[in-house]
Regions:
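Prokaryotic Sec-type signal peptides and long signal-anchor helices
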Residues: 7, 207, 290-291
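Compact mixed alphabeta submodule
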Residues: 130-260
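Charge-rich, solvent-exposed alpha-helical interaction surfaces
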Residues: 17-20, 239, 243, 286
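Surface-exposed polar/charged interaction patches
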Residues: 20, 24, 246, 290-293
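Acidic, proline-/serine-/threonine-rich low-complexity intrinsically disordered repeat tracts
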Residues: 255-277
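Short acidic, low-complexity intrinsically disordered linear motifs used
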Residues: 275-295
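OB-fold ssDNA-binding interfaces and closely related basic DNA-contact patches used
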Residues: 1-170
Length: 295
């Protein structure tokens, strides 16, 4: 726009400026909450309690899905919060970078790899039987994200360790069992060790009309492992470079490959959801939205 145009249109831009300001304000207050996902409420001490019923898969599908993601802040001040392509059996640039860092033989590089390692998540449908801190959730079907500790408890129900224990499918309407989620704060992290299954019983007293009503509310789990919902390798590598900076990624990708080519690549163990503090989890949930807006 020329100076003459600016002069001629003086005063007429105020409405555009007001609209832009209002748009900015509204974007700052918009919700980042996915109402489909149930999250436990904890008190000031970090303790919480709820009773859940794990629900079966829809149309004969497995009742849970597993995926990995990465969540870390780079030296640029930007966040990298993206699903890992390893969730769908593909090579992921962060995984490649972490392997190179780990193989560099430099301890500080290993520390970087640890802070950037994968986070493991499971997702399933649950019916909230009891939620004392948020009773409005009771009687509703939600998606529930959890980590390895809770998954191990589910697996142990289906594959008991001792011969005198009967296997229980916790996802079964008629022969499953309620799950008593007990959360404690142990050294700043959420601990689920006290959580346990109740004795097996028929869900909702086995009333078929109610069971069918719950079944019809099941959320689709395939979105979490649908390749269409994952960025491409090149898109992720571009984002990674932006977050870590050109120098950081360039240095890591030029480790002496001729020396390391035939060396075994040690796996960097994924961090589970339980190994994150509740504050870290909430922070990453918020910044994941901001990270997407930066792209």
């Amino acid at each position: 726009m020329s100076f003459e145009t600016l002069k001629r249109n003086r005063g007429s831009n105020i409405n555009k400026i007001i609209e832009a300001a209002q748009s900015t304000n509204s974007s700052e207050t918009k919700s980042y909450v996915d109402d489909r996902i149930w999250k436990p409420t904890v008190d000031k001490a970090g303790n919480g309690y709820a009773v859940l019923r794990f629900l079966p898969g829809k149309d004969g599908e497995i009742p849970f899905v597993r995926y990995w993601d990465h969540g870390f802040k780079g030296p640029t001040g930007l966040w990298y919060i993206e699903n890992s392509l390893t969730s769908i059996g593909q090579t992921d640039p962060v995984g490649e970078l972490n392997s190179r860092l780990w193989n560099s033989g430099i301890e500080s590089d290993k520390d970087k790899a640890r802070t950037q390692k994968r986070r493991l998540h499971y997702v399933t449908n649950v019916y909230v039987v009891s939620d004392p801190s948020a009773p409005q959730n009771e009687g509703k079907v939600f998606l529930y994200k959890f980590g390895k500790k809770i998954f191990d408890k589910i697996y142990d129900q289906m594959n008991p360790e001792f011969a005198d224990e009967t296997p229980v499918d916790p996802f079964d309407f008629w022969e499953g069992a309620n799950f008593k989620l007990k959360i404690r704060n142990v050294e700043g992290y959420r601990n689920y060790d006290k959580s346990e299954f109740a004795s097996p019983d028929q869900f909702l007293a086995g009333e078929e009309a109610k069971l069918e009503g719950v079944y019809n509310q099941l959320h689709d789990l395939t979105e979490f492992t649908n390749p269409k919902n994952y960025k491409t390798y090149d898109e992720l590598k571009t984002k990674l470079t932006k977050v870590l900076g050109e120098t950081a990624t360039a240095g890591a990708y030029t480790v002496k490959e001729e020396v390391k080519l035939n060396d075994p690549v040690p796996a960097v163990e994924p961090v589970t959801a339980e190994e994150m503090s509740s504050e870290d989890e909430d922070t990453l949930s918020y910044f994941s939205k901001l990270a997407k807006e930066d792209t």
